[in-house]
């Protein structure tokens, strides 16, 4: 997007003000310190040892955390301690007027960190203890101070030494039944011969053993019954989750000469201490009670509750929230089955997944009449049955100046008391473009709607026996959409889909649509058709009306949870096929008409035959408290087959824009090394292809908190690369086809910086992109473009620096 002149002047003033503040912040912040004080300006951790570089990086990050490095230097913004300078303006310079009262909010201030050598020594002690807990019993930590002009920096030198690995694993379990459970699950053990010793691994193993024992019915089993003993010591070193190893290092001195020092571990599971030498008792489920309309602070003994005894469950309620048959099937507990912690979690999650209840609480109480029996009580607090919402959107991209949209959404979460959800939505939007002459013009308009039904089970048009414990949801949807690109084309589409959605695990999700049907109708503006489409056979075939019907399968993996706060992954793969069953219907119609007609001739619409595969992998690293590194790799390919020569326009790949390669405008990059320099490119610059490769790296960091922390100003720097290609040669677009030996030459590369305003519930993003490598640039054999940069030339900046404004992160 090119900003209008007045906007650029305003932005220039803002950036100039920011530069002045940063320059002031770079000035000395030490003049208010006492003579014997110094400002703590930096800390560094050097890790040396015979370990992998990735392990060194993880150790360096852990040792730099606030919990171990007790004194942290003041944060810097663009090499300036602006927050310390602002602090001094408020408390030492006593600045106070309306401007400073806004700027000098507490969120934007940092008290100068005065260096304290005692805290450095405490950090050394904590780091050493942490390294011992990671199995580095011979580790040493030293530090060096560097003082200059009342500023101190500290370097911590860490030598890891050799890491202990586990050797022999033995078990001391007097209860033979529990010992059998442990051995049956031993292949899943986290402590095995050759594994590096870490106290966290033993803690995780304790949790794993506790879980499998509780899943076998041992309701009262306590994790504190599990102890670990190392080597020949008869001392339980790991009675607690965190264990300092001070005082025990001398035990392992005999291992110093070994290439890989080892230790034996004995796992001991004690019998319950409160009942002498008796063994742990297995419990089973006795009775199950459900309260489907239980209010907050309700009374389960309320005499006005109606009671309905179903096959497995006694339902107590004032009114029917869910049909009793469906209610009983949704509860996964069964009388007579052993107590299971996993079944507890599955039951709660299944009931939450229905979407009917706001709170789900499952409690167990011992049955007074039967030994080792538990009664289960499910307290369910309902949500509101119907929801109505309105969403407003404002957007911007390099393709249009201003976009706005509104959507109206309605949802009934419990249709006919069956757990079926009815959803309806209407949406409309426009895109406006500000021309060089100044006036705003309408570039596109869109409106559409969708109706969907979601069943909390595996729904089929015929009856089959199903496992009640399945978490499959069935979804049927019907939608329509109309998109008009002014003076170019109108696209009308109607789509129908039927399929299933389920979670294989907490990290893995499947979306399967065995039936999808999409009709796409295209009406071309006559002038656009004559001047652009008719001159491009590929574009002409792309804009033909089409029937897209087939199957769609998606697999999603995401481990973004509390266990993976430092780094986590996201992976999605999607496979779509169109034409297989439509061609079958086409053949049947043709045979029934004596080969006179078929589905295509009757509807005057071509069947689209293609297979499309996409894969999207992302990984995120948290770098300290205020930084993060986000990476993404995307690959996609679509292959037309049978009578189809090209993919439908709405299924083709594009590159460039705020969520792609940001140094190019939306949909203008590629394919390959092709550059459209014809007059039609000014009318319709969109470029599409059959395949796409893309990679992105983005470093994100915090800048300032504003208005009491309600708005956070964040920054980013990024590197994007990729392109689109054709599968086959296109004589009208030379260089557009994919050739492996030309891959490096064809890859486009761009870099840039960005700022983001984070309002918590949404984020506004402004990115500046500039090309590093241009596939169609002929001045360098590999397309490197840096030598052509002319940042002083306003016309060059206008044509090469791309401004992208968008809502949300690019990935």
Provide a role label for each language-model segment.
Residues 1-10:
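N-terminal secretory signal peptides that target proteins for export/translocation
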Residues 3, 28-353:
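Interaction-mediating elements
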Residues 23-26:
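C-terminal motif of bacterial Sec signal peptides marking the signal peptidase cleavage site
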Residues 136, 218, 385, 417-419, ...:
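Strand-connecting loop/turn motifs
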Residues 178-181, 320-321, 340-572, 587, ...:
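Gram-negative/organellar outer-membrane beta-barrel architecture
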Residues 301, 395-400, 511-712, 717-742, ...:
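C-terminal outer-membrane beta-barrel translocator/porin domains of Gram-negative envelope proteins
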Residues 390-392, 422-426, 476-478, 571-575, ...:
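Membrane-embedded beta-strand positions of outer-membrane beta-barrel proteins
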Residues 406-412, 449-455, 496-500, 551-559, ...:
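Residues on the lipid-exposed face of transmembrane beta-strands in outer-membrane beta-barrel proteins
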